[in-house]
A protein has these predicted regions:
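Amphipathic, non-transmembrane alpha-helical secondary structure
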Residues: 8, 12, 181, 185, ...
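Conserved core segment of the aminotransferase class I/II
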Residues: 123, 300-369
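N-terminal basic, amphipathic alpha-helical segments
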Residues: 1-128, 309, 333, 337-344, ...
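Conserved glycine-rich beta-strand-loop-beta hairpin in the small C-terminal domain of fold type I
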Residues: 369-379, 390-404
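Conserved core of the PLP fold type I
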Residues: 137-272, 284-285, 290-301, 371, ...
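Hydrophobic residues in well-ordered beta-strands that form the structural core
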Residues: 196, 217, 276-278, 351, ...
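N-terminal small-domain helix-loop-helix segment of the aminotransferase-like
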Residues: 83-175, 182, 356, 424, ...
Length: 468
């Protein structure tokens, strides 16, 4: 442990033991130099670390003070993704998926949008059409990197945002999760360090365990996203190889990074030679006028692997995703050949047929409008029926709300009780191996709203009220 970490740990222990109370002023940097015998730079780094972890706050012209509620946000710590921890996460995920298959359960825990939102009849017609005209060569033509017309169509979508990506850089995959996993394999070896958000998409934690990678969690703000100061401290301390990050409509929190933050993020990762694996599956589900740019838009050094899919915005059942892989494209193709061999040829051809009709953008406009309306309606119902002590964190994109229960309530326990009433919610610890998010849960707003959903929220409010 480095000297500044030792000092930070000492001060954390003093705060935890009550030596320093919330609101107390800490010794100034110069006084701490005299007290500790350490250099000014070491003391400064220690204070910066404590500030990034939420233990202390800096006040201009006044100094450093113990935070009112240390610690609000998760600190930058190692998450050892051990088998036991992964089993706990997998249990939550298994229970959630099982519940989503039961039509009697109101699926507020689901990760998927309502399938009735998608143009399934048109897509099925496209699938039937290509099945009639497919030849024996179709399978060969659609081997990695995938159907050339589909890759060209995806490249044109990038071009609409001013991002130049050659179809040759794009690899078609079996959904975004395969794109993300292959990207991770392409830039890491077992034992390497990978940064993940906290909380993060649970598939990231499962992937790290499977590939025997070490996870590093960095503080993430519910509204603003990644703490860049905490990120830089982590990059200084650990030999990080990759960063798995959602930049737009993050799951489960829902935030979208600002363009300024994306620029700084790409520059910082480039400085430390860290590859960004950008998970951008929700990018089409924005509610504003313009689609938010991915971090890939500012990639000038081929340091961003941009992964997305059609699963959340067009057709979940087809399992078609892609990665804009740049210089890693050939390696990812080889890795894909050794695992899944290729992505479904009929599904690729059906998507090419559908995209050629120019109906896609009209569908997306309709989808965004419906999701925004459903999110607003769900939010209003939650405000009506849930106790005032419950905080609802709302973002203007996607279809998730992030709810915060008051202490000492536990979302995991609430989710189990709710299931007995045929209501599912996704507890926060699904998205982290620690206990930082045990009072939080994710709420899916994408399903058609009716009397059943209204009564389910009302019942959820009663269950929470009983535990206050």
């Amino acid at each position: 442990m480095k000297k500044y970490q030792q000092l930070a740990e000492q001060l954390r222990e003093q705060i935890a033991s009550g030596i320093w109370q919330p609101g107390d002023r800490l010794p100034s940097l110069r006084d701490q130099v005299a007290l500790s015998g350490m250099s000014f730079m070491t003391v400064s780094h220690a204070y910066q670390l404590l500030e990034s972890q939420g233990y202390i706050i800096a006040r201009p012209q006044s100094g450093y003070y113990v935070a009112p509620q240390a610690i609000k946000m998760p600190k930058a710590t190692v998450i050892p993704v051990t088998r036991d921890e992964a089993v706990d996460i997998n249990t939550y995920i298994f229970d959630m998926l099982q519940a989503s298959r039961d039509p009697s359960v109101v699926p507020f825990a689901s990760a998927f949008p309502d399938p009735r939102l998608f143009p399934l009849q048109q897509l099925n017609r496209s699938l039937a059409q290509v099945s009639k005209t497919a030849t024996a060569m179709s399978v060969i033509e659609n081997l990695p990197p995938g159907n050339v017309e589909l890759r060209q169509a995806i490249a044109r979508r990038y071009a609409l945002q001013g991002i130049t990506i050659s179809p040759d850089e794009i690899v078609i995959t079996a959904g975004a999760l395969e794109a993300l996993n292959l990207s991770l394999q392409a830039v890491t070896e077992p034992g390497d360090w990978v940064i993940v958000e906290n909380p993060c998409f649970y598939g990231a934690l499962q992937a790290l365990e499977r590939l025997r990678l070490k996870a590093l969690s960095v503080a993430t703000d519910i509204k603003e996203g990644i703490d860049l100061q905490a990120l830089e401290l982590a990059l200084q301390e650990y030999p990080v190889k990759a960063y798995w990050l959602m930049t737009n409509s993050q799951n489960p929190l829902g935030f979208t990074l600002t363009p300024q933050k994306k620029v700084r993020l790409v520059a910082l990762l480039n400085q430390y030679n860290v590859t960004l694996i950008e998970d951008d599956v929700y990018s089409e589900l924005y509610f504003g006028r313009e689609k938010p740019l991915p971090a890939k838009a500012w990639d000038r050094h081929d340091g961003v692997l941009h992964c997305s899919s059609f699963s959340k915005c067009l057709v979940p059942g087809f399992r078609i995703g892609w990665v804009a892989a740049g210089k890693h494209a050939r390696k990812i193709q080889r890795l894909q050949l050794m695992s899944t061999l290729s992505t479904s040829s009929p599904m690729q051809l059906a998507l090419v047929d559908y995209l050629s009709t120019r109906r896609y953008d009209a569908h997306l406009r309709r989808l965004r409008r419906q999701l925004a309306e459903r999110k607003q309606r769900a939010w209003q119902a939650l405000l009506r029926y849930l106790p005032a002590e419950v905080k609802i964190h709302h973002n203007d994109s996607g279809y998730f709300l992030w709810l915060e229960l008051p202490e000492p309530l536990d979302a995991g326990e609430l989710s189990l009780v709710a299931l007995t009433h045929h209501i599912s919610i996704a507890p926060g610890n699904m998205f982290s191996t620690g206990e930082n998010w045990s009072r939080f849960f994710r709420f899916n707003t994408a399903w058609q709203w009716g009397e059943r959903e209204e009564q389910a929220v009302k019942q959820l409010g009663k269950l929470i009220q009983e535990r206050l």
